Amino acid sequence: MAGKSGEEKMKEMEAEMALFEQEVLGAPVAPSPVDPVPLSIQAVPIIRPVIATNTYSQVQQSLQARAAAAASVVGPNFVSPVTFVGPAIPPPRPPVMRPSFIPHALQRPIEPHGAMTRPSFIPHVLQHRAPGPRHPGMPPLQPLMAHHMHGPPPPLMRHIPPPPLGMRPGPPPAPMGPLPPPPRPMVQSAPKINPTVIQAAPTVYTAPPVRKPEEEIVEPPIIPEEKESLSYEETVIGPSMPEIEPVQPEVVLEPVQEDKKKAKPEKLKRCIRTAAGTSWEDQSLLEWEPDDFRIFCGDLGNEVNDDILARAFSRYPSFLRAKVIRDKRTGKTKGYGFVSFKDPNDYVRATREMNGKYVGSRPIKLRKSQWKDRNIDVVRKKQREKKKLGLR
């Protein structure tokens, strides 16, 4: 019984492989009314160890090669029908273009028969490999392709009905009418897109760079400019060189004399003051105009500053400036300041009207400023006059 069971298992395996090959190649499989022989599931673990790690990759390669061959053979047979290129074509494209490996046992619908649910399956690639360990009662293996190449399959494989169209891999629906046209639109669309891109590239990138350098080269006329420059140089070199040399020193000498003249009055603007037998230079007097009319403002409070003093005398039209004298170290006021006017009439009016008026918290006291009496020139002149009069 052990030997018979092994032979039956091998026949079942060969029948399943033959059916799978026929489905892949697209050959019709006639269902047989014979009921399948139920087999025990215990035979599965004996066959599974034969599958190796590279079984999936080998099966994928064989399926892709056969799918490509089937597509190339089926293509020219359906040249005449043009009606199938309509909108009904796109749905079947994915199964036709990408055949994927799915075991035959998983593709078939589940039925109440026990033979339909068994997971025993060996891919076609395992037939080419070296024979694995066998039982002593098993016969030698034979290529499974002989069943469908040389004659009809054995009677044991006819009891398996073909799977539905939805569960089959890519190649089986090749004989169907609407499936062969899909490769055509893809082949026709590709050449249409490529030439358009190739033709657009040269027109966009080649035309502008060729025109720009030509325009740039043509525009600048270099030859006439060189001739003109040479002609100007020839005309200028002769008579112009001796004429320019004598003119330059004359122009340079004039500003030197002006600078000397300007330097003299700057030296005379020094304000030297003398008092109590000492003399010093007061630079603060240079801020005032020498020809103005100044008023001495005394008895000023600590809160009075330049702005308050200027606001008190700004109603006069010829008012120039007002300043409060402060201690350089502490910054406090010394209690007096000066106000200058350009018009002597305003000077007289301000002295009469503002004398004794409150500026800040105290009444202001005004009198004529005697800042010129402390100048060294004025002091020396007075000393000479006194000597002439014999006072000293």
Curated annotation (Swiss-Prot):
Keywords of this entry: Cytoplasm, Nucleus, RNA-binding
One term under GO cellular component: cytoplasm
Broad class of the protein's primary localization: nucleus
GO molecular function: mRNA binding
Cellular localization per UniProt: Nucleus; Cytoplasm
Domain RRM: 293-371
Chain segments annotated as transmembrane: none
Stated role: May bind RNA.
Recorded family membership: Belongs to the RRM RBM42 family.
Name of this protein: RNA-binding protein 42
